[in-house]
UniProtKB/Swiss-Prot annotation:
Annotated positions binding substrate: 40, 113, 149, 302
Pfam family, one: Glu_dehyd_C
Name used for this protein in its record: Glucose 1-dehydrogenase
Keywords, alphabetical: Carbohydrate metabolism, Metal-binding, NAD, NADP, Nucleotide-binding, Oxidoreductase, Zinc
Amino acid sequence: MDAIVVSKADRTPRLVDRPRPDPTPGSVLVRTLRVGVDGTDHEVIAGTHGGFPEDADELVLGHEAIGVVADPTDTRFSAGQLVAPTVRRPRGDPTPQFDRGQPDMAAPGTYVERGIDGADGFMADYFTSPADALVALPDSLAAHGFLTEPVSVAEKAIELALASRSAFDWRPDSALVLGNGSLGLLTLAILAARDDTETLYCLGRRSRPDPTIDIIERLGATYIDSRTTPVADIPAAHQPVDMVYEATGHAKHAFDAIDALAPAGVAALLGVPAAGWTFEVPGSDLHRSLVLENKAVVGSVNSNARHFRAAADTLAALPDWLCDAIVTGVHDTAAFADAFRDGETSIKTAVQFDTR
């Protein structure tokens, strides 16, 4: 079967032939339809994030996938059913977090991540997965179901942010998304659909005309160019906001977000910055702001099957035009390299292995 890999000797993604995997009892053989490409994939390719499977020189890429059950073995699934796989698996014996169905809360070193760190991903004609790591999707999501994974990540982060404010009567009506990549835009759409979020902002570094700005404004949000209005200046230029959702991986944004918050606001951090960057921050001022204004900062990574199910519902409810606008390129395996190229008008790309 076809598979897209990187190797220790060659970090350039390439198409190779691999044997089709055989499912074991309790696992499912899935025929892959589409696999998305995101910033994490580029970090894996560059060697700045993740790692290879134990005793292997190659890693099959891809962690955002949708496929069709080819062989359900003895599981609850049926042949032909549409499914999306979660990403984390135990490294050795499962920890209590895995036993509770919360692999997203497992400690580093206790898990591998398909297509990212220590385990082959889903960019292949077929893959196998334990049944409990698969989520059934409606047939209506056959084209865009690979977005379930990134939407699930947004669902978890928003859930954590709301939970941090659940001890009191919090009534947020404004939010700021940092980052106008695909994850930021999908999150903006989720927030736009909430009844309590009346004012939305999205920060980026693109100049008009630009398709991401078009999407932002079509969702009813205000675009902020960080080159003219840095995050810390947003309260003066616009307003302090109740929620900040950081999806840039720019380390200073973690601290600037505190300044952007209104009293009792919360910032959710998702971006993972490169290690080793040091800079000065006004520590006592930030500390005072957090305490005296009841602000909170939460970190969030990965997601679990419950978030995937919520993401499937969210995707099905998004405006029909949105996914078509965000997914700017779907490439078959003969032209898979195009999915890894960033263009001025590209937002989200995917590799297509098969059709429904």
